């Protein structure tokens, strides 16, 4: 029993790995073993009393079970490349279980993990996963329970009747009409006005032989620049070849800021802004029995296009200057990644090694109206600031991880990650006329910036128990990083056609050393009936050594600062099912951070500024309360309620600065937020399904600058609500209606000292449609959509109203029963 319980806990935490600073999150997700253990302490208890009862009728596999497996399970748990190494294509494979546990216990359906998953009594693990298929009905779960209780009888002939070829395609056509700001609508929805169409999805799968399967799937929506294709050839106990390509487009609004008192309160660039992104990947793998699993691959990622920015340019009207003129940024980004993954189980020890080599290139150009640019109304600015940036680097990293069940009650893991990055960058800023010629203004150059970073990370973790319904976890992680930078800089003010006013170049160099130690502990108790009680703590100590030096220029300086940071985070709570159909959970978290700065060496030339050497301490402390209730009031009514409170105070301490501050600690900021949420799912009448959910967040923030017109306290709320209804009109036709609404009202009237702060908007989306199942495996979907957005803080510059019509015909061969 201890071994089985420990296996359940180990599975609950496997693979939940956080990402750190690395650009390649995949390696770190598979490596960092220190922080995932807390999740096992807060997972909810499984309440078997919530399971639908088993069917009382005798079960026929071909009639009752095979259709359920085909519709909900076999896409992921078939013979080739089964998820979690769990197969449902034969009785022997199903009873063998997954990679770490038995899933089906013949004659004991209430204890079988398969039933817990499909019944969704474990909120941390549900099958089919959300978004991968519809949840099983109580009737289907009852049939599965009866099948298991009756001995898991299997009809091999029924399984062999599965088609060797499966094909599906869903051609679609869409019409969209927009009045108002079309660019804002595109930014919110990703839809372009007019007529568009393509294949919403397509797939082809063929079982070449008993061990080999080929699959092809994707989508193609040409006018949306939305494409995807995946190919896979898998042979059981041999290996696989996989390739995929994906491209998408994201749109941006070309409208800048708004200042109502101006004669022309807002501007638009008058061009379509979008960013194309995509990736291509190719993997080859070996999956030979009793040999290490090897995967060798290549991946290419890219972004290319133009996006709007929130750092707008100047508009001068009536002698008043406001930063509201829209700015844009062109981006050309490419990343090449080589990868090698090894996995192997050796004498009870799981060994994983992931290596990555990355080559990265980035080129950007920003266009923005220059400060003091003379224009008003709809006139083009007289001058622009052009900012060009280039960056490239290579990065190599390797992660080695080990895990082992040391005893019946102790599971351990350890790992090491090494990473090295070297790169260079450049920066140029020019002020030009509207025609592209030189203009008076800032000319700023940093032609060569060299960067180097090296990091080592070690981690170890252990999960012990259970003993007398108690489990304990502990993890420690240590990371050391050194970053160095060296570059030149030349800031010049004037006109490129005449000598510059400040032609003196400068040289900058810096070094940042960081050492971080993190400890995490947790305790979990399941001794109370239907209840889990947990407590956990996370502690972090970090030391940072900073060296910065500027040689030359008007404000040369040298700074050497040590910083000691400390974090403490404590959390405790419970999850209980006091009666059938009800679950209650609550938790409390307290978090404190403090950073002390010691300026060991600080030299400033006369006329220079003391910041940031004038900072001595930063600290924060916050509390969070979370409570949730889930209650099945009746067989046809399930409801959920939630509440969360977060409150954080910030303190800053400084040195004295004559004429400005006497120094010492000051309460620099405060933030409070209350969030209420609720949800209902109802089936009050035959053929009707209703759902509704809503949440409201009320926030308040203040800062040390209270009383100054340009930085005012603010308070406001965000509310969102969704509701829907589905009516089974006929056995083959469903009608659907849904509505989503959100609103924010935390805008501040702050015109006296600056631009408005915050936002006020109102957004509605209504969807109505029908789905009808035609003959020969075809399904038709028709849908109407209504969208409306208003933003009072932007006048009418961002508002729009839109209507959409969508039609999709889904075809499948062979026809599903």
Give, region by region, the residue ranges found by the protein language model.
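Residues on the lipid-exposed face of transmembrane beta-strands in outer-membrane beta-barrel proteins
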Residues: 169, 200-206, 229-233, 282-286, ...
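Aromatic- and Gly/Pro-enriched helix-to-coil junctions and flexible linker segments
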Residues: 45-162
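Outer-membrane beta-barrel initiation region
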Residues: 157-208
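Outer-membrane beta-barrel translocator domains and adjoining extracellular loop/strand segments
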Residues: 180-186, 226-230, 244-246, 254-260, ...
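Transmembrane beta-strands of outer-membrane beta-barrel pores
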Residues: 173-179, 187, 218-224, 235-237, ...
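Repeated loop/turn-to-beta-strand initiation elements of outer-membrane beta-barrel proteins
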Residues: 69, 209-215, 237-241, 290-294, ...
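Outer-membrane beta-barrel "beta-signal"
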Residues: 176, 772, 801-817
């Amino acid at each position: 029993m201890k071994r089985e319980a420990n296996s359940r806990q180990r599975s609950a935490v496997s693979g939940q790995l956080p990402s750190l600073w690395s650009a390649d999150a995949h390696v770190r997700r598979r490596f960092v073993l220190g922080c995932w253990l807390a999740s096992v302490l807060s997972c909810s208890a499984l309440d078997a009393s919530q399971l639908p009862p088993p069917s009382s009728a005798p079960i026929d596999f071909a009639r009752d079970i095979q259709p359920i497996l085909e519709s909900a399970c076999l896409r992921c748990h078939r013979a080739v490349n089964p998820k979690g190494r769990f197969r449902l294509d034969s009785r022997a494979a199903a009873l063998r279980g997954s990679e770490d546990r038995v899933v089906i216990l013949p004659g004991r359906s209430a204890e079988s993990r398969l039933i817990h998953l499909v019944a969704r009594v474990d909120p941390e693990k549900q099958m089919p996963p959300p978004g991968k298929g519809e949840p099983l009905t109580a009737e289907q779960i009852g049939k599965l329970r009866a099948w298991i209780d009756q001995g898991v009888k299997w009809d091999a002939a029924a399984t062999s009747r599965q088609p060797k070829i499966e094909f599906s395609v869903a051609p679609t056509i869409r019409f969209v009409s927009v009045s108002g700001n079309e660019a804002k609508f595109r930014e919110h929805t990703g839809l372009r006005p007019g007529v568009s169409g393509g294949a919403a999805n397509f797939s082809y799968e063929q079982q070449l032989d008993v061990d080999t399967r080929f699959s092809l799937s994707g989508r193609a929506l040409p006018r949306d620049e939305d494409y995807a294709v995946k190919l896979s050839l898998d042979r059981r106990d041999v290996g696989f070849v996989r390739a995929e390509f994906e491209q998408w487009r994201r749109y941006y609004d070309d409208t800048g800021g708004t200042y109502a008192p101006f004669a022309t309160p807002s501007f638009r660039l008058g061009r379509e802004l979008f960013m194309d992104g995509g990736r291509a990947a190719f993997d080859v793998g070996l999956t030979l029995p009793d040999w290490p699993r090897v995967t060798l691959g290549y991946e290419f990622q890219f972004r290319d296009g133009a996006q709007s920015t929130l750092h707008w340019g100047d508009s001068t009207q009536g002698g008043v200057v406001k930063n509201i003129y829209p700015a844009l940024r062109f981006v050309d980004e490419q990343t090449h990644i080589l990868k090698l993954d090894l996995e192997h189980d050796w004498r009870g020890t799981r060994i994983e090694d992931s290596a990555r080599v990355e080559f990265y290139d980035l080129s950007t150009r920003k266009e923005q109206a220059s400060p003091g640019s003379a224009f008003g109304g709809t006139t083009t600015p007289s001058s622009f600031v052009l900012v060009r940036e280039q960056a490239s680097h290579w990065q190599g990293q390797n992660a080695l991880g080990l895990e082992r069940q040391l005893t019946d009650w102790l599971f351990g893991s350890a790992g090491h990650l090494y990473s090295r990055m070297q790169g260079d960058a450049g920066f140029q800023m020019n002020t030009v006329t509207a025609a592209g010629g030189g203009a008076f203004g800032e000319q700023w150059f940093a032609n060569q910036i060299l960067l180097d970073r090296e990091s080592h990370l070690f981690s170890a973790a252990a999960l012990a128990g259970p003993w007398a319904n108690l489990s304990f976890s502990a993890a420690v992680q240590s990371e050391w990083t050194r970053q160095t930078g060296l570059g030149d800089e030349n800031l010049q003010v004037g006109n490129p056609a005449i000598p510059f006013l400040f032609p003196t170049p400068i040289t900058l160099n810096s070094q940042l050393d960081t050492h971080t130690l993190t400890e995490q502990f947790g305790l979990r108790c399941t001794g109370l009936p239907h209840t889990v009680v947990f407590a956990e703590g996370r502690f972090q100590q970090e030391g940072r050594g900073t060296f910065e030096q500027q040689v030359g220029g008007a404000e040369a300086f040298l700074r050497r600062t040590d910083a000691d940071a400390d974090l403490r985070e404590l959390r405790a709570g419970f999850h209980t099912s006091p009666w059938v159909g009800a679950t209650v959970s609550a938790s409390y978290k307290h978090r404190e951070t403090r950073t002390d700065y010691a300026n060991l060496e600080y030299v400033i030339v006369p006329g220079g500024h003391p910041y940031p050497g004038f900072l001595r301490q930063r600290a924060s402390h916050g509390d969070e309360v979370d409570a949730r209730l889930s209650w099945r009031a009746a067989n046809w009514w399930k409801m959920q309620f939630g509440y969360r409170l977060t409150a954080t105070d910030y303190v800053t301490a400084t040195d004295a600065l004559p004429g400005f501050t006497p120094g010492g600690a000051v309460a620099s900021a405060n933030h409070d937020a209350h969030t209420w949420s609720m949800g209902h799912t109802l089936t009050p009448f035959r053929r009707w399904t209703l759902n509704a959910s809503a949440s409201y967040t009320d926030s308040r923030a203040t800062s040390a600058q209270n009383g100054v017109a340009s930085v005012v306290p603010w308070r406001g709320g965000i509310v969102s609500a969704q509701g829907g209804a589905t009516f089974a009109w006929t056995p083959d036709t469903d009608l659907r209606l849904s509505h989503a609404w959100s609103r924010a009202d935390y805008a501040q009237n702050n015109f006296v000292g600056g631009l408005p702060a915050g936002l006020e908007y109102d957004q509605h989306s209504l969807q109505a449609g029908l789905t009808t199942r035609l003959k020969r495996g075809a399904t038709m979907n028709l849908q109407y959509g209504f969208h409306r957005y208003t933003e009072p803080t932007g006048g009418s510059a961002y508002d729009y109203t839109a209507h959409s019509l969508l039609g999709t015909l889904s075809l499948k061969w062979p026809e599903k029963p």
